[in-house]
């Protein structure tokens, strides 16, 4: 083998190894974004149930019995810096085709999840108007019911996508570990606190 050919092979072998490590690290972080969203699913489901009770009480002319803020899911954006770098460079050309396809599918999924998490967050921002019920008018309640319907649809959609990514688009990686402090932060968010007053017996 000519020295120039040997040098080129060594160079690209090293470059691919470094790029692969960066991509795998980024994938692990992006998978943890999906895990983070699913950790909040019990809080989201409970809040949607509580909001339905609020709407039923309003329709019946009953006191709303609000005790807390509506809150919203915390959003972690998926990173794509390593993938963008690889896409605009030449290292991907030196990886096996199957690996390139697997990596591409994973990052497409992460980008879609990141976008849908942001859209879901906007819907919950709309629902946050319930934090000030005294200034709501009839038209506001109609808008809030529509926002509730959207939030329920987004919940189903985003939870499914997050679970799909964690089972089907891992590129052979596992999510970065979310420490106990992360779980504690979720528990302390308004979304995971009771919305309604506890009935006294």
Predicted regions and their residues:
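Hydrophobic membrane-insertion alpha-helices, especially the h-region
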Residues: 1-5
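Long, hydrophobic alpha-helical segments that serve as membrane-spanning/inserting helices
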Residues: 6-201
């Amino acid at each position: 083998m000519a020295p120039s050919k040997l040098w080129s092979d060594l160079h690209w072998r090293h470059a691919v190894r470094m790029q692969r490590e960066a991509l795998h690290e980024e994938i692990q972080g992006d998978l943890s974004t999906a895990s983070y969203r699913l950790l909040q699913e019990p809080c989201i489901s409970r809040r949607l149930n509580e909001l339905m009770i609020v709407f039923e009480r309003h329709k019946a002319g009953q006191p709303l019995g609000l005790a807390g803020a509506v809150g919203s899911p915390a959003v972690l954006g998926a990173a794509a810096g390593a993938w963008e770098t690889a896409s605009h460079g030449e290292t991907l050309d030196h990886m096996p085709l199957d690996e390139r396809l697997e990596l591409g599918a994973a990052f497409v999924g992460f980008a879609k999840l990141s976008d849908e998490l942001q859209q879901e967050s906007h819907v919950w921002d709309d629902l946050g108007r319930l934090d000030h019920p005294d200034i709501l008018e009839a038209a506001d309640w109609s808008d809030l019911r529509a926002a509730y319907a959207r939030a329920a649809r987004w919940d189903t959609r985003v939870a499914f996508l997050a679970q799909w990514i964690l089972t089907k688009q891992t590129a052979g990686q596992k999510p970065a570990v979310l420490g106990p402090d992360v779980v504690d932060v979720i528990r302390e968010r308004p979304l995971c606190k009771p919305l309604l007053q506890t009935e006294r017996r």
